[in-house]
Every structure is written in structure tokens, then in C-alpha cells.
């Protein structure tokens, strides 16, 4: 995927691979951008088009066709079942799993003016926003991190929520007004985890990835994804 965040995550996998395998030449790991249906649909909520698999289908097709050797995903976007022959074989250490509250007019969700507009396209976030502040108006907010922050600065909404991990990876942690306590806004399953998918018969790639796999993160992700299975 070609968004700044997707590229940053791919670069993190590449840098960890090169660090773990000093004999591996830098040009031995090339990043290939593949546009997904989910990236191209910006005007409507994803639930109208089939949900999370929209961010993985084209990438997995390229993996099965042998056009790429590994696929880098945000694990929160990966369906609980992956296509036969593929597997999530590597998970990087988890970043901050919390959602970040961003607003130019308030220091917290509770401090937003009555009837304020909040931008979000996430059913999970919208449900929890309305539980805490049923008076707020929620508008659809699609797009990558930069697009959503631009909409916020243009006044399309007075607040929005973005994953803290994504902002950290983009070097934009200073844009977070306040991290949301997990007992107020529960993060998505496997939020803040980068996963690497490959063909299960590609033992060479699996062996390379084994050195950057984080077992503790894998246990957490397995437990969380089991709730969705």
C-alpha cells in the first residue's frame, strides 16, 4: 500500500531484516507498492464494501502469484482467516495500542463543546464516542493519516481519533492531544502490530523473518484475534 504509514511500516520491516541479517545486501529487500480496493474507496464507509479484507485482497493475490515474497500488514486490518497457502509468520513488537484524541479546541473527549462534530469512519470508535458523549455529531472521516489531519485543520470536524502507533511511526506523536484510556476507548483487535504474511512453502523467507518475530506480541495477537474467530 502506498500511504505514508504503509510505507513507513514496510521500511521498518526492511530495516529490522537488514539489522538481523548483516550479510543481506540492502538492495536484496525491495518495497513494492500495491494499491488495494480499500485504499481507493474514500467517499463511503468501508462497511458498505465488505470490510477489512479490502486492505489485503490484492496484496495476497500478488503473494500467491509469486510477484512478491512477503506482505506487510497492519494486523488490525487482517481478517481472521487468510487464504490457503498463506500465513502470518512474523509479528513485530507492538507499539502503543491506544487511540489518540486529536482536537484544536479541546484537551479531551469530555471537554468538547456540546454538539461538537467528531470525524470517524470506525464503527468501533463511533460506538464508544456515543457511549461517552451521545450529544456529539459524528461525520464520516476516511483517508490516510495526512488526509484526516488536513480535514481536521480545515474545520470539517472539531476532533478525530487516530491510532497512536501510526502517529508515532510517522514521527507525528506531537499531534496527539491526549491518548485515550483503554477503559474509555478500547482499541481494535491487534491494533499497533505490524504483521508479515508469506507463502507457507517459502521456507527461505520464513527463516529470514524468524529473527525479527516477537513471541510476546504473537501471544497477545492470537488471544485477541481468537475473540473474532
What is each PLM-predicted segment?
Residues 32-34, 73, 91, 121, ...:
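Conserved beta-strand termini and adjacent loop/short-helix elements that scaffold enzyme active sites
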Amino acid at each position: 500500500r502506498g500511504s505514508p504509514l504503509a510505507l513507513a511500516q514496510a521500511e521498518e520491516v526492511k530495516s529490522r531484516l537488514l539489522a538481523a541479517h548483516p550479510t543481506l545486501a540492502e538492495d536484496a529487500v525491495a518495497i513494492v507498492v500495491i494499491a488495494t480496493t480499500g485504499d481507493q474507496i474514500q467517499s463511503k464507509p468501508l462497511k458498505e464494501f465488505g470490510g477489512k479484507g479490502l486492505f489485503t485482497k490484492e496484496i495476497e493475490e500478488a503473494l500467491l502469484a509469486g510477484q512478491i515474497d512477503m506482505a506487510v500488514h497492519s494486523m488490525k486490518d487482517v481478517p481472521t482467516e487468510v487464504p490457503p497457502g498463506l500465513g502470518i509468520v512474523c509479528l513485530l513488537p507492538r507499539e502503543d495500542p491506544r487511540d489518540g484524541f486529536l482536537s484544536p479546541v479541546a484537551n479531551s473527549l469530555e471537554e468538547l463543546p456540546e454538539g461538537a462534530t467528531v470525524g470517524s469512519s470506525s464503527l468501533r470508535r463511533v460506538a464508544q464516542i456515543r457511549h461517552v458523549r451521545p450529544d456529539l455529531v459524528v461525520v464520516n472521516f476516511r483517508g490516510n493519516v495526512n488526509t484526516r489531519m488536513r480535514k481536521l485543520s480545515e474545520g470539517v470536524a472539531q476532533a478525530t481519533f487516530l491510532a497512536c502507533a501510526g502517529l508515532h511511526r510517522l514521527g507525528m506523536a506531537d499531534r496527539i492531544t491526549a491518548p485515550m484510556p483503554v477503559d474509555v476507548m478500547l482499541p481494535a483487535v491487534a491494533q499497533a502490530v505490524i504483521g508479515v504474511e508469506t507463502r507457507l512453502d517459502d521456507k527461505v523467507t520464513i527463516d529470514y523473518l524468524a529473527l525479527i518475530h516477537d513471541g510476546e506480541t504473537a501471544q497477545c495477537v492470537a488471544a485477541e484475534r481468537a475473540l473474532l474467530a
